[in-house]
Amino acid sequence: MTLAPAAVDFSSFVAGRKFKTILADPPWQFQNRTGKIAPEHKRLNRYGTLSLDDIKSLPVASAADDTAHLYLWVPNALLPEGLAVMAAWGFKYKSNIVWQKIRKDGGPDGRGVGFYFRNVTEVLLFGTRGKNARTLQPGRTQVNIMCTRKREHSRKPDEQYPLISSCSPGPFLEMFARGKRDGWAIWGNQADESYSPSWATYSNHSQSPAELQLALA
């Protein structure tokens, strides 16, 4: 079987290293209700996507330690696909963390999309592989919800990093990362220090407070 370009690039990046905790936010493809691949809005040039088969073919199992944790972001409409990816990567689903997107006043941010309901949440699936793969002691009291404001399209909250690093052991790998992060190996076409969003979506709060301070300095 010929590996897709993303799988080849990932294998080259990992180069035999092993990680005990992996965080992934794949660029999922969506199908609309007619079964066709739903394109991004024409006014928003965001990012390319990968097919389900391409995501499943990434050799994540070879990058994971014998005992490891996986945190996998998945849209509400693609939960079955997320579970299939988790299994293809060699992990068993155990639990999840819900991200509730809120407004500045703390209420639910109703600008999400959805055919059946207006989505104000995303799900971070948690899976394990190997023996004795329970979370670290802080995980035993960590609630499985994050309530934060959304940033630019698809970007996940920075609050996930201290949560993950307190509940799971290193070394840490982030796949499809945006920007650099101390203490993490990062892979993806936006994984560099100069990353900043190239579209105006939610521009009024697309930066973290720290980034806003730097931008205004």
Locations of the language-model features?
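Class I S-adenosyl-L-methionine-dependent methyltransferase catalytic core
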Residues: 1-217
